[in-house]
Amino acid sequence: MPLFQKAVFLTTVANLRDLPQDSVREVAFAGRSNAGKSSAINTLAGRVRLAFVSKTPGRTQHLNYFTLDEGKYFVDLPGYGYAKAPEAIRSQWEGLIGPYLSKRDQLAGLVVIMDIRRPMTDLDLRLIDWFRPTGRPIHILLSKSDKLSRQDQTKALRSVKAEVATWGDADLYSVQLFSSLKKAGVEEAERVLASWLDIEIKQKENKGPPDKGSPGAKMP
């Protein structure tokens, strides 16, 4: 049973003045257009259409807030990097998302979703460089891991971990494999997000041997 299964849509925010005013913690999800961001949110919530999955990249252009059972929030940020996005939309992204990421006191951490076949693009790194000065944690989901063999998954994971290790502050940064299609990596992601949101994870009944899951998330 997903930890965040009671997530429900709350509101869409197009201007910073419309952000929720309560002081509860929230986690933001960012990623390139079509990297699997909305699918990852839906998978973590155990829902099919909580976050809208568009076949048209760059469609989502506002902050979408989802309320969790514990009163905390998931925030779905607009996908970035879609080349055909009009200049006005790109400017809106920078005008809304930049201040949100740098100044939102309630933001507990940032989840960056990257297609495992094309991780650490220039735009991914620009976003991360934008966020790192806040001193808040970043968790990278290498999505669509089912598209690669186990050997290539491990190779990609090691490569991204090696680059992340150069950032220093190892406790702030973590990486894992994730597949919305196979529901792989869900519990691993839940543990990270629960710690950020200060949510207790109830022990699950052990009905068999432990799931080996993906090969590691924490930085060495």
Curated annotation (Swiss-Prot):
It holds the Pfam family MMR_HSR1. It comes from the Bacteria. Mg(2+) binds at residues 38, 60. The keyword Cell cycle applies. Residues 23-199 form the EngB-type G domain. InterPro entries: G_ENGB_dom, GTP-bd, GTP-bd_ribosome_bio_YsxC, P-loop_NTPase. GO terms for biological process: division septum assembly. Keywords: Cell cycle, Cell division, GTP-binding, Magnesium, Metal-binding, Nucleotide-binding, Septation. One of its GO terms (molecular function) is GTP binding. One of its GO terms (cellular component) is cytosol. Its cofactor is Mg(2+). The keyword Zinc does not apply. SUPFAM superfamilies: P-loop containing nucleoside triphosphate hydrolases (SSF52540). Necessary for normal cell division and for the maintenance of normal septation. Belongs to the TRAFAC class TrmE-Era-EngA-EngB-Septin-like GTPase superfamily. EngB GTPase family. This is Probable GTP-binding protein EngB. The lineage of its organism: Bacteria, Pseudomonadati, Pseudomonadota, Betaproteobacteria, Rhodocyclales. The gene is engB.
